[in-house]
Amino acid sequence: MSETIACTPESVVFDAPQLQFNEEGWGPCELPDAFRDIPYQPFSKSDRLGKISDWTGTAQTDKKYSNKYNSQFGGGSQYAYYHEEDETTFHLVDSARVQKPPHQRGRFRGNMRGNRGRGRGNRGGVQGGGMTNLSKNANKGRDQRRGTTRKWGNRMPPPKIRDASVAVRPDWVTIEEMDFPRLSKLSLPSVKEGEDISTCGTLEYYDKVYDRVNVKNEKPLQRVDRIFHTVTTTDDPIIRQLSKTHGNVYATDSILATIMCCTRSNYSWDIVIEKIGDKLFMDKRDNTEFDLLTVNETAIEPPQEDGNSLNSPRNLAIEATFINHNFSQQVLKSGEKETKFKFEDANPFIGDDEDGEVASVAYRYRKWDLNNGIVLVARCEHDAVLLTPQGDTQFLTIKALNEWDSKVANGVEWRQKLDTQRGAVLANELRNNSCKLAKWTVQALLAGSDQIKFGYVSRAHVRDSSRHVILGTQQFKPHEFANQINLSMDNAWGILRCIIDICMKQKDGKYLIMKDPNKPMIRLYDIPDHTFESDGEEEEGDDETSAFQPYSYTAKPAATAAAPAAVPTPVAAAAAPAAAPATAAAAVAATPAEEAPKTTTPTSAAAAVAQK
């Protein structure tokens, strides 16, 4: 059965759509309502589709170049493409070693010619070739041990801010700032050898048995209870007498060495200078840590532990001072039957009520002509004498280098290297203690010592700072050792002369030289005359309890020459009770020269000398 469809003009109607014509652009004239609230999402046909700021995507492995050069398109993880491995294409690969032609064998072995004959088994060649195959981790660890960095991401922690040796007060006026690059260029050549004015004290002879001490034949360090006098310049009775007839600049060898070697120092220190008329008196403050020996001051990573830690900078300095005092006395031939070398005058710091035994130290008062009317008078020290096979007498300066923890200090194991590679041990000490060794050398040169003898002292146990052993000794001539450590005495004299000239141009008063704790420079301050005297007046009645004690476990009552109060340490600090400047100056001026008091403050002593 069929049905016939009639096609008439009324059954099909075509309505043409309404077209919009945009005369000003290419897009539609208006946005339809169906697409009005849909957010716009850009895309590129060459990239995977993604969203703007899609933080839910997987993080890139290398953050260094993250979102730096990549496109923003295709960041969405929902559009990510994951490739599925097709195991049908897996096949074995022949990993057999390919035999190289004869002319290519040994092509990348390196130069082995210079590594032959370095011991049995050619150990030198193995070490030389292995150095070129260090991995990145090995290089990184080596750089960290050396304290160096190669990448910006491996920056070392910022250096620790050090404290100043004395707090700068608001009423101090800065006169001069001298940076180390300028000071290192100074020079004062042709300074003649010092001329002896007076010699005092008694010395013991060095025991040559300690020259045979080595790592296998070590000797324990003994505690020698003797008194060491650390008298400052204006408390020295000999200098007070010489200031009337000799020179116009007065100091001690330790003060001069600190100034001359200031360009090598990193820690803060200070020296008080007093100008009265045409005379300069260089002093150290009482009850300070000026006489303590620094440890690893110039190392790449100096000790930075705080508090009462065993390896804190202050405890290490106290330990080094304790070792030096005991070592310098243990290596001598001591005893009532042993002969001693006596100078013309006796030790000027031994009082009538001296109870303990005084250390073997002799004092040599010398003067130097620095030209332009500057004559320096200083007190220098000798530690011992040595009788040569020819019968000559040589004066010695004895010092000790101490090992505390080679792993923490990035140093060399003394017990492994000292007997076979002593030069490497000394070179490591020159890097870590450049300032201390330079000051010892300057002191030996100023005193005119014939030899400077170093002792290598290590802890018996790395975690015990109270027991030590002597591992060996080594001696040098001061001039030769100065050349080895690149110490220029012309530059040292130039630095001293520069500071003296600056102070001589100032008005009469008290000044302070301080090493900046965090910058390579020293500053000269103009300070009031009574700056460091108030503390001494408050502590006048209790010197026994307030005196500086270098080492806590070596307490022994010992009287000092300048202060009758007992100081329970082997290092007797000659700290005298401070008096009012006007009263002390008037008292000194009213008394005869031979009755002048010996216990006055630096200001009082200098003022009294100038008035007379």
From Swiss-Prot:
Native species: Culex quinquefasciatus
Annotated protein name in UniProt: Eukaryotic translation initiation factor 3 subunit D
UniProt region (RNA gate), positions on chain: 289-303
Keyword annotations from UniProtKB, A to Z: Cytoplasm, Initiation factor, Protein biosynthesis, RNA-binding
Function: mRNA cap-binding component of the eukaryotic translation initiation factor 3 (eIF-3) complex, which is involved in protein synthesis of a specialized repertoire of mRNAs and, together with other initiation factors, stimulates binding of mRNA and methionyl-tRNAi to the 40S ribosome. The eIF-3 complex specifically targets and initiates translation of a subset of mRNAs involved in cell proliferation. In the eIF-3 complex, eif3d specifically recognizes and binds the 7-methylguanosine cap of a subset of mRNAs.
Transmembrane regions listed in the UniProt entry: none
Disulfide bridge positions per record: none
One Pfam match: eIF-3_zeta
GO terms under cellular component: eukaryotic 43S preinitiation complex; eukaryotic 48S preinitiation complex; eukaryotic translation initiation factor 3 complex
